[in-house]
Amino acid sequence: LETDRAMIRDGLVWRIYADPTDGTPARFVQQSDAALPVFHLAPGAYIVHAAYGLSGTTQRVVVGSSAAKETISISAGALILNAMVGDSPIPDSKVQFSIFVAVGTDPEGRLVADNIKPGALIRLPVGSYRVVSTYGDTNAITSADLTVEPAKLIKAILRHRAATVTLKLVNNLGGEAYAGTNFSVLTPGGDTIRDLVGAFPSLILAEGDYFLIARNNGKVFTSEFKVRSGIDQDIEILAR
C-alpha cells in the first residue's frame, strides 16, 4: 500500500498478460491470489495487474533470463459500514449500503458498489465517495460523504431516523384486524409511498407525517399518523 509501504497479505488478485509488440490485444497468461506470487514466464514484456477489492493498478515489466522481483504500490484504503437507529444497531437483514462517486455536480453520478451488508470490508481506491444507507425497502434512506485515505481503514456508522409500523383495520382499538385489507401509505401532499395488502402488514418508514387509506369490502377508511424515530407502533384505523 502507498504511504505506509505495508505489504498486502490478503485480498489480492494478480493477473499477468503478455504485452504484444504487433498492436494486438494483450493475452492473458497467469493468475494468482497469493500475497507473494511466483510466476514462471518466458523472457519478454508483460503487463501485471494487481486488484485489491475495487481498487487496482497496472505495471509493465520486462522479464529476462534470470529471476527478478517486482514491487507494485496500490493507492487504496477501506471502509467498514454500519447503521443504527438511536442507540440500536439495525439488523443486517434490514439494511444495505451503496457507494457512489460523483460525476460532475451529481454526488451519486456513478455506482461503485451496492448490496453491501453491515460489517463488510470494502476496499476502495483513494478518493471521495457518497455512501447511501437504505433501511427496509420504502423511504428510510440516509447518506454520508466519506473520504478513503491511503492505507487507512475507516469505520463509519450511518444513523437513520425511522421506525417500523404495523397497519391494521379494526372495529375497536386493540381488536382483531380485518384480513385482505388494501392499505396505501401517502405523504401529506398525496404522493403514494407504498401499497400493501393483508391483515397487519408492516413496513419501515422515515420519521415524519403520513396519510393512510384502508380499503376493505368496498369501503374506504382514512387516517393520519406520525412516525417517531426508534418508536415502533401499530397504526389502527377504525372501520366505522
Q: Which residue stretches match the model-derived regions?
A:
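Short Pro-Gly-centered beta-turn/loop motif in secreted/extracellular proteins
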Residues: 33-47, 51-54, 116-139, 199-218
